[in-house]
Amino acid sequence: MLGSHNTLSYLRPKKWWAWFTIPWSKCQRKDLEKQYLCGVKYFDIRLRIIKGEWHFVHNKIDYGPEDLFIYQCLSDFGDVYVRILLDQREKPKYPEEYKELFLSHLNFLVNCYPGIHFDSAIVFWEWKEYLTPQINVVENHFSVKPKKWWEYILGTRYFAWKVRKENQDEINDPSMVALKDFV
């Protein structure tokens, strides 16, 4: 099954300085519907609380407040899988409370969007799974693959092009996911 790594990184960053990080932080150019039409069935969504509300993020990059329309679209597609990450890299001051908020929010999403299979819920700072995944995810993207120093400078788009043909078996196997940049 094809999965998109950092699914929502096609969105525009909210802070001006984030534009300088696009070669390394942007992992998708296609919007949600185009990703789905290209065969993506597994979506990687990252959240963090910023100023008291949930935001779509990728590490330090803020894409703005969580828009529930995203989940409605995914639910309408039907038979899709979502991995939700609490993308807080460093351990917060009150980690247990933060995890409780995350799990409560996850429960809300699961109940509101029955067309989505929430397959994974990870708290980033401890990389701990809070759901039991049914699908084996093969990470095949810029942040996990070994690369030469000059490949790092070229960014995620170059690297996605370089590894585009890898993991074809996982894409054709419904029990596995090849998580890729720039699907």
Feature roles, as predicted:
Residues 1-42, 49-81, 89-94, 116-183:
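Long, acidic (Asp/Glu-rich), low-complexity accessory segments flanking structured domains
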